[in-house]
């Protein structure tokens, strides 16, 4: 295990040295494994598998079938996302990391070393080859989405005795991904603060937080948490869920999301990412789920109520892209494997009314043969890989 954690500074790039050469910060105690999953989580999951308890066992069968121990990675030296002077190849990364995650989970739950070796093979291929992430502005999305996913795979594998590549994986994430995460939150690609929608900040925060935990860097973790609480970008909590309504009849809060007037594909993605950031933070002792009177729950209830076919109120929203006077019905009813995590925490752990989140979870399960799938289960394009998924076996409590 590393004796000290590494943090990036802009100065490092400016003077032409590696981020890992910039300076080190002594970490506080960070719990491992402690991103999306903890040891207690895996003990619970193993119990469900042993008991063949439904619907969790249905989720396990789906996950186990997806974990291909013979998977061959397609690592690239340069990942390109977005039209630019490069040829887009980022699908190689999101497909590989989804395969690594499934294999790492199956190893951790079932103990099969072939699955561990497959996940290691994928991680080592990327950490030994990747040098840059380039492309249009979409490169910032790649650094965020695939950064948090890679970090979660590495966090699971860190307990595998056969893996000698943890330091190399950390170096890749700290040297390549984190500087982009930090730069985006500071500069937003040189654009006005409301130019980039909430999901851009949120995936960036998920990556920054997860890389901080993986590398035992409390300063990096704090950077993500502080920005989420007080930042000026659209992914900060008060901006991501920017207006609170009172539901007619129940009186419970419904939080209008920043992307509600854009389309429901992105509006629901925001809550997948909010769930990731909150779950990772909760496992490190910081409860973002309850922040500002359970604001994430209010937003989840609003978004999912609309996406299961119910009407919600809408307040006119204006940003750099124009003015939305009505909620968007584009992609209404979109299917994402994100409801299990949010419902398990708010209803199962907190005992709160999360009825619309539960109905959305059930709608996704009805469309998914009874259990959430994962990367690749919901289409071959990047949107089908934005969330890691498999929530029925990983998060379901009842």
How would you describe each model-predicted region?
Residues 212-321:
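Long, repeat-rich segments with strong aromatic
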Residues 1-26:
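Fungal secretory targeting signals
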Residues 149-150, 207, 273-276:
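Amphipathic alpha-helical segments that form well-ordered structural scaffolds
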Residues 91, 197-200, 266:
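Residue-level marker of regulatory loop/turn positions in helix-turn-helix DNA-binding domains and
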Residues 23-190, 202, 229, 251-255, ...:
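Extracellular glycan-targeting catalytic surfaces
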Residues 135-139, 195, 242:
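Acidic, Ser/Thr-rich low-complexity linear motifs
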Residues 179-214, 218:
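Loop-centered beta-sheet repeat module
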